[in-house]
């Protein structure tokens, strides 16, 4: 082979290797990206019919948390539609009424059966020892 052909072959092999590496990186990133649907998107979209696991995000409706012996149910809303969620397991400490949550699971017979519940938190979190009291006590 001529030197020119060897160089061309090396450049082509380098491009193929770089393309394969890029394809691998993008496929791994796609699996780790964590987006979610709103309750309206889930209930009106094609995801409603599929039995594939999806993530749904919204706010926990106040007064909707009901605990039974083996599960917890609550309603999740995007302020347009509500979705009833059933979960068996430990809830995160930040979970509560009026708090943002993301649930992962499947929609079965109008109820969302969650495998995982994540509570969103305020980005302005500050530990208790650093917080300033809202009102100082009256001196006696």
From Swiss-Prot:
Molecular function terms, GO-annotated: heme binding; metal ion binding
Pfam family, one: CcmE
Membrane topology, from the record: Single-pass type II membrane protein
Residue numbers on the Cytoplasmic membrane side: 1-7
The name this protein goes by in its record: Cytochrome c-type biogenesis protein CcmE
GO biological process, one term: cytochrome complex assembly
Disulfide bond annotation, renumbered to this chain: none
Ranges annotated as spanning the membrane: 8-28
Function: Heme chaperone required for the biogenesis of c-type cytochromes. Transiently binds heme delivered by CcmC and transfers the heme to apo-cytochromes in a process facilitated by CcmF and CcmH.
UniProt record similarity statement: Belongs to the CcmE/CycJ family.
One annotated Gene Ontology cellular component of this protein: plasma membrane
Keyword terms, alphabetized: Cell inner membrane, Cell membrane, Cytochrome c-type biogenesis, Heme, Iron, Membrane, Metal-binding, Signal-anchor, Transmembrane, Transmembrane helix
Binding positions for heme per the UniProt entry: 121, 125
InterPro entries given in the database record: CcmE (IPR004329), CcmE-like_sf (IPR036127), NA-bd_OB-fold (IPR012340)
Major localisation: membrane
């Amino acid at each position: 082979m001529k030197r020119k052909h060897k160089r061309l072959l090396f450049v082509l092999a380098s491009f193929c290797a770089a393309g394969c590496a890029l394809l691998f990186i993008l496929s791994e990133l796609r699996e780790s990206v964590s987006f979610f649907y709103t309750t309206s998107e889930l209930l009106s979209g094609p995801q409603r019919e599929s039995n594939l696991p999806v993530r749904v995000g919204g706010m926990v409706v106040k007064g909707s948390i009901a605990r039974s012996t083996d599960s917890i149910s609550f309603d999740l809303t995007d302020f347009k539609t509500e979705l009833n969620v059933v979960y068996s397991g430990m809830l995160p400490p930040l979970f509560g009424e009026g708090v943002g949550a993301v649930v992962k699971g499947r929609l079965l017979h109008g109820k969302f059966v969650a495998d995982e519940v994540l509570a969103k938190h305020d980005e302005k979190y500050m530990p208790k020892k650093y917080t300033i009291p809202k009102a100082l006590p009256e001196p006696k």
